[in-house]
């Protein structure tokens, strides 16, 4: 136990440059790479971040469909735009109807617009 404590004390007293040199010497002696160990250790965290679910969505009107008037009415109700602005948005599709909404609201808006006859995408 005393030997281990001496090693800990010796390692604690090393400067950063000495610790880097020690790491190089150990890599050569053991035939390993510290960079590979760091990459392997970081991989699970990166995978967890990739799985993280998107929290903000943009409801995109891809196409008005056959019931353009119904879609215009629904766009007006959702956005609060005037008749001309809503008509321009619908006729200018693909356009964003609402941005920065959560998943639940985005799904609700998508369902409303699709019920009116529009083709909708969530981004």
Curated annotation (Swiss-Prot):
CDD domains: Ribosomal_L7_L12. GO terms for cellular component: cytosolic large ribosomal subunit. Gene3D superfamilies: 3.30.1390.10, Single helix bin. GO terms for molecular function: mRNA binding; structural constituent of ribosome. Pfam families: Ribosomal_L12, Ribosomal_L12_N. Keywords: Ribonucleoprotein, Ribosomal protein. The keyword Ribosomal protein applies. InterPro entries: Ribosomal_bL12 (IPR000206), Ribosomal_bL12_C (IPR013823), Ribosomal_bL12_C/ClpS-like (IPR014719), Ribosomal_bL12_oligo (IPR008932), Ribosomal_bL12_oligo_N_sf (IPR036235). One of its GO terms (biological process) is translation. The keyword Ribonucleoprotein applies. Homodimer. Part of the ribosomal stalk of the 50S ribosomal subunit. Forms a multimeric L10(L12)X complex, where L10 forms an elongated spine to which 2 to 4 L12 dimers bind in a sequential fashion. Binds GTP-bound translation factors. Forms part of the ribosomal stalk which helps the ribosome interact with GTP-bound translation factors. Is thus essential for accurate translation. NCBIfam families: L12. HAMAP family: Ribosomal_bL12. Belongs to the bacterial ribosomal protein bL12 family. This is Large ribosomal subunit protein bL12. It comes from Rhodopseudomonas palustris (strain HaA2). The lineage of its organism: Bacteria, Pseudomonadati, Pseudomonadota, Alphaproteobacteria, Hyphomicrobiales. The gene is rplL.
């Amino acid at each position: 136990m005393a030997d281990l404590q001496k090693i800990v004390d010796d390692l604690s007293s090393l400067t950063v440059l000495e610790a880097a040199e020690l790491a190089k010497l150990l890599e050569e002696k053991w035939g390993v790479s510290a960079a590979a160990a760091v990459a392997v250790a970081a991989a699970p965290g990166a995978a967890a971040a990739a799985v993280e679910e998107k929290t903000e969505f943009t409801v995109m009107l891809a196409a008005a469909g056959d019931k353009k008037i119904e879609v215009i009415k629904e766009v007006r109700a959702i956005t609060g735009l005037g008749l001309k602005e809503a008509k321009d948005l619908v006729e200018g599709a693909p356009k964003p109807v609402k941005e920065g909404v959560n998943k639940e609201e985005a799904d609700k808006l998508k369902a409303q617009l699709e019920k009116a006859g529009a083709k909708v995408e969530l981004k």
